[in-house]
Structures are given as C-alpha cells and as structure tokens.
A protein has these predicted regions:
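Single conserved hydrophobic/aromatic residue that forms the stacking wall/gate
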Residues: 1-11
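Mid-chain, well-packed structural core segment of small domains
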Residues: 67-113
Length: 146
C-alpha cells in the first residue's frame, strides 16, 4: 500500500456521472485521489486512461485504483494486461469484498451503465475496507504471472 493511500480514478464517458459521485464518497472520507480522467461525457478510448492508472498502481504512486466504464469489461481487460495489476469487475458489495479477501484486487472496476449510486457506495466501501486474507489465496495469486 502506498503510504498516502491515494486512489487512482479512470472513467469512460458512460461512467462520468458515477465518477463524480464516487469522488464525493472519497472526499467525504477524507481520502486523497488522483483523477486520471476523463473530464466529460464525450466518447473516449478507455486504454488511454487505463494504462496510466495501471502504471501508477504498479509503481506504488496510487493504491488502490478505481475505474468505471460502460460495462467495465474493456477497461478491466486493459488493466489486467499489466503484470502487477489485479483489476476486479464488481457491481455488488459482496463481489468487491471477495475480490479483496480472496484475490487481493488492487483496482476496483465498476460498470457505469449497470450500477446504482447506492450499490456503488456499498461496493466502494467494501473494496476499500476489506483486507486480503492471504494463506491459500496468496499461493493462488503467486501462480498468476507468466
């Protein structure tokens, strides 16, 4: 974990409104974050935002990351191309909790088209507050890199 517990945010146009809502959640908790974009609802290419976030998480400059796009799939696929990234597509609190407990996910990905603000609040809080269990789960994570 980065000592500053900074959060990296990447958002595609379908997640822009949810991005602004998530920033309010983070602000209310006094958590610092770096917003990697986008800054509007205009169409954009998610890899242009995903790669800088992934590199920042890998370098320890921000931790954890939060990414939002329409379905969440494209940005999750892009993020997971990076060796040090375990991006988890989550749309419910329990999925986010398990992604942290069992998979030590370091980037939360949410589908902007398919998650309400209420569920996003619970999902973000679960992701930020759930520790990794380690043990047998660490053994499995150690087998991920090629």
């Amino acid at each position: 974990r980065s000592p500053s517990r900074g959060l990296g945010d990447v958002y595609k146009r379908h997640g822009y409104e949810l991005k602004e809502f998530v920033k309010q959640i983070l602000d209310s908790k006094g958590l610092a974050y770096k917003d990697f974009g986008t800054d509007s609802t205009e169409s954009c290419d998610y890899p242009d935002y995903a790669h800088p976030l992934a590199k920042a998480v890998e370098a320890g400059k921000v931790y954890p990351g939060i990414a939002i796009c329409g379905s969440g799939n494209g940005i999750a696929m892009t993020l997971n191309k990076h060796q040090g990234i375990r991006a988890a597509l989550c749309w419910q609190e329990e999925i986010a909790r398990l992604a942290r407990e069992h998979n030590n996910a370091n980037i939360l990905v949410m589908p902007g088209r398919f998650i309400s603000q209420e569920e996003a609040t619970h999902t973000v809080e679960a992701f930020l507050n759930t520790p990794f269990e380690g043990g047998r789960h660490q053994r499995r994570i150690d087998k991920i890199p090629l």
